[in-house]
Amino acid sequence: MAKDYLFEIGTEEMPAHVVPRSVSQLADRTRKFLKENGLKFKDIKTFSTPRRLTILVEDLAEKQDDIDEVKKGPAKKIAQDADGNWTKAAQGFARGQGMTTDDIYFEELKGTEYAYVHVQKEGKKASDILLGMSEIIKAMTFPTKMRWDSNDFEFVRPIHWLVSLFGNEVIPVKILDITAGRKTEGHRFLGDSVVLANADDYEDALKDQYVIANAEERKDMIVNQMDELVKENHWQVKPDRDLLEEVTYLVEYPTVFAGSFDEKYLNIPDEVLITSMKDNQRYFEVYDENGKLINHFIAVRNGNKDYLDNVISGNEKVLVARLDDAQFFYDEDRKYPLSHFVDRLKDVSFHDKIGSMAEKVQRVRMIGDYLAKRWNLPENVVKDFDRASELYKFDLVTQMVGEFAELQGVMGMHYARLAGEDEEVSVAIKEHYMPATAEGPLPETTVGSLLSIADKIDTIITFFGAGMIPTSSNDPYALRRYAYGIVRILLNEKWSLPFNEVLPEIISLLNGVTPARLPKSDVDQEIADFIRDRVKQYLQKNKFKYDIIDAVLASSQQDPSQILAAANVLQLHHDDEEFKPVVESLTRIDNILKKAKFKGNVEVDESLFEDNSEKELYVGVQNLQEIESLADLYQGFVQLQPVIDQYFDVNMIMDKNEKVKNNRLAQLYAVSELADRLGNLSKLVIK
């Protein structure tokens, strides 16, 4: 007969972000443990709050299945020696089955006698096996662990109680001096201890003690109560899954309430108010029906509605104290012109090994001007970029950003607007941090995109120059994210930037005008490869076939926009009927050139043509060389493929005449160079 098994670890309050991952880990480890021990079960449910990690194993078998089976061992000639004595092989076979050589018998199978044993073993009781749950607790991992008392044992937070019930039977799992029983704890302030008669009583018993053990149920309670408040007051609340998830795991019994603050604080930029409420206090900001931020907030209490007025008042006082600080910083910062803050950047270190923030600003302007010229950007964009690059780090020395570091860039935008700067300049100051995460939003303005790329290129170049290069396991300065951001912005703006050409030019440009240690020439390619790896990440993220990714990255192409264009062409036509013969013809050319070790140092000489097919290929290649679009280039290869095949049918490539041979290899080399624009096609998997 199957019964439910309840296992609860009761702790001091855990950080909210740790709880869901920890209870999932507990369930996964338990699932593996039960399967390894041959205990059948239906499913595992999880329950979790800041003070408990709980699993409920549904329909767990009371014992392992009994074993009644025949095990085949070594052949008789291996199991016994010439005198009939048991060999080590036979002894090991028997021992491995929990038996002795006395239990071995022989039977013939396909003309050969083999050793067999008949294994009969009664399955172990679940109650005995479940004592091993203590090992699961010991094996659990966490970002940070704690020790308590004088023990060496570590856990995410000190353990205060354990519950271990198989049906109505206590399984006395033990950790340190704590032995599991049937008593759990209710809400820290509102509930009492509860003695559980049966594992199935868990959820309902805790509800009576103001603990909603099911995290999804708590989340639904929060959402429903918020919806009621919003509807009642004609408000709007923007969805925030991360904050909702966090408050769900901060409380055991959620009660939603609304608070307010003086309207005078609404003169502060919205982002400051939202940060004060959301990031510092875990409040949801509130908007009116027109989407305008208003002087109200919604929060979640860990408890019921008793004394809710006192709770609201206390939360309002805490928020107002933070808003008073924010108002002070805002007023103080606005007393000074932007130039006051820009001048102070010379005293701000970008990095000890690289130099000051003022020096970085100088380098970034030079990089941006170089890129703008390369991309032939309009004069107004260059003008706005130059001004934005002069200002873009000034807010780092404002009091507001000193208190709210997460608002760097945002406050720069607001202060620049207040100072009368052009909107493009102001927005670019904010956008240069974008994307803030790997897949975060990109800059929406051209100036912002240019400033973001220039800033990130400078960071990567100078960190590589200072020897602070990411390893496979360590990237403390987020250089991979910066490089990925560069790739995403380039592709979004459709800007061409072959890094093998550009990086040496940028480094040469910066040398002599900045004290930062810049990479030597032998590091140029290392940086280019580093950024190229982020192109691979982009292609993988966008679901390109693995062989197409391998092909386009194995080409000599260094421009991310061209690499993406090639990948799009190959992905689009991968399943076309013509794709296989085109690729086979082009890879045949590469194989011939590789075998001949031809380096392409010979010009094609029409006077050496001996057949019309050579002229046809020559003209076809010349036409393809005029094509810029990779999509059109592929279609050109589709048209050229029969010409290539005819060329091979008629001509002996490795002709005895050295000049003719080299001329034909030169023709093939010209085709190969064009094909390389699409990728190293030998990497493609063609079916």
From Swiss-Prot:
GO terms for biological process: arginyl-tRNA aminoacylation; glycyl-tRNA aminoacylation. Belongs to the class-II aminoacyl-tRNA synthetase family. It catalyses: tRNA(Gly) + glycine + ATP = glycyl-tRNA(Gly) + AMP + diphosphate. It is found in: Cytoplasm. It comes from Lactobacillus acidophilus (strain ATCC 700396 / NCK56 / N2 / NCFM). HAMAP family: Gly_tRNA_synth_beta. This is Glycine--tRNA ligase beta subunit. One of its GO terms (cellular component) is cytosol. Keywords: Aminoacyl-tRNA synthetase, ATP-binding, Cytoplasm, Ligase, Nucleotide-binding, Protein biosynthesis. Tetramer of two alpha and two beta subunits.
